[in-house]
UniProtKB/Swiss-Prot annotation:
This is DNA replication and repair protein RecF. Transmembrane segments: none annotated. Keywords: ATP-binding, Cytoplasm, DNA damage, DNA repair, DNA replication, DNA-binding, Nucleotide-binding, SOS response. GO terms for molecular function: ATP binding; single-stranded DNA binding. It comes from Corynebacterium diphtheriae (strain ATCC 700971 / NCTC 13129 / Biotype gravis). GO terms for biological process: DNA replication; DNA synthesis involved in DNA repair; double-strand break repair; SOS response. It comes from the Bacteria. Its main location: cytoplasm.
Length: 397
């Protein structure tokens, strides 16, 4: 897969931007704060319906505007599709493919496939469990877009159930019994949460089983002198670690039973304590968790291994994802830079952002790449980003 054209309107610092892209390596060069990361962030947003930098869509809309528009034309095995996304500062986003309006932006999942390396990847090891859950869910939704909808539905049911738990806890504290209306309704929400949660837990266990060997091999290539790396999924819904993975229905039954066991504690705390929203991905080096025990270099090697495993897993499915390297070379030592560059030779398209050319490995600067230069200009509406403003044409090397 490769992206043939990207068009932005009022996305962060870009009032307008249209750039034609080609297979191979494309480099966006610009000083920090000039807006080069915003370009690849827009592509990643269309791919995953989320930003790797912020949690709220309002930050993506240029100051003073009500909405932003991102259009990405992707070519996959000769078939061309254009994904359009209208991002609103307030209200629901809208999406379409070519000229067809979609019922939900979630229907865009799978149209554009990307794997992003960025400085924020350190959170995959050092961050909270939510970062690692998000990593797994992105991989799952890219491969099976339907499960992206399951995750969204689960989050909605979870919010409603947590609200009910707070109501039930307040009722008990006021002296009402277990037959109070709010409390009796929990059974219905438990069933819905377990049905959706069982599907998510099964999907995560399944993808971790596939990613595990890829992570191990990638880490061994990047850091052959280090301890072996492996990953494992840790769930609040226990099951016997057997060769054959339990079905979604079996996970659903196990989760429902666990919810029953924890009901009193959940009502007391007013929060759901069981389910995929409480799970984690253990990242292990040797016999110790990488978080807290890995050196800075080992942490970066593990983060790269997780992303490389993601890339190869999607590639094994039959489609080369677009590889995005966002200001990541500046964070790596020479050895890790070269290991990462070796992967770029395998990808159909690579998009790279860098503040200065010195951040790039020699093997990359010597290869044929398409270069674009990002600058800024001050206007009455504020500072805006410009692409190739000096000449008005792309710079190829």
């Amino acid at each position: 897969m490769y992206i043939r054209e990207l068009s932005l309107r009022d996305f962060r610092s870009w009032p307008e931007c249209t750039v034609t892209l080609e297979p191979g390596v494309t480099l966006f060069v610009g000083r920090n704060g000039f807006g080069k990361t915003n370009i690849v962030e827009a592509i990643g947003y269309v791919a995953h319906l989320g930003s790797h930098r912020v949690f709220h869509d309002s930050a993506l809309v240029r100051q003073g505007k009500e909405s932003a528009r991102v259009s990405v034309t992707a070519v996959n095995h000769g078939r061309e599709l254009t994904a359009h996304l209208l991002i609103k500062a307030k209200g629901a986003n809208q999406a379409q493919i070519n000229r067809t309006r979609l019922k939900s932006p979630r229907e865009l999942l799978g149209v554009v496939k990307t794997v992003l390396f960025s400085p924020e990847d350190l959170s995959l090891v050092r961050g909270d469990p939510a970062e690692r859950r998000r990593y797994l869910d992105h991989v799952i939704a890219t491969r099976k877009p339907r499960l992206g909808g399951v995750k969204a539905d689960y989050d909605k049911v979870l919010r409603q159930r947590n609200s009910l738990l707070k109501t039930a806890g307040a009722a008990l504290r006021r002296g009402y019994g277990a037959d109070d209306g709010a409390l009796s309704t929990l059974d219905v929400w438990d069933s819905q949460l377990a049905r959706l949660g069982g599907q998510l837990i099964h999907a995560r266990h399944s993808v971790v089983r596939e990613l595990g060997p890829l992570v191990h091999d990638a880490y061994a290539r990047i850091a052959p002198e280090s301890r072996p790396a492996h990953i494992r999924y840790v769930s609040t819904v226990p099951f016997a670690d057997v060769v054959e993975l339990p079905s979604p229905e079996e996970f659903e039954a196990a989760m429902l039973a666990e919810l029953g066991q924890c009901r009193d504690k959940e009502i007391d705390r007013g929060v759901s304590l069981v389910g995929p929203h409480r799970d984690d991905l253990d990242v292990v080096l040797g016999d110790y968790p990488a978080k807290g025990f890995a050196s800075h270099g080992e942490t970066w090697s593990m983060c790269l291994s997780l992303r490389l495993a993601e890339f190869h897993l999607l590639r094994n499915d039959g489609t080369d994802p677009v590889l995005i390297l966002d200001d990541v070379f500046a964070e790596l030592d020479t050895q890790r830079r070269e290991k990462l560059v070796s992967v770029t030779a395998e990808a159909e398209q690579v998009l790279i952002t860098a503040a200065v050319g010195d951040d790039l490995p020699d093997t990359l600067t010597e290869s044929a790449v398409h270069r674009h230069f990002v600058s800024v200009a001050d206007t009455p509406e504020g500072r805006i980003s410009l692409l190739d403003a000096a000449t008005g044409v792309p710079h190829d090397g």
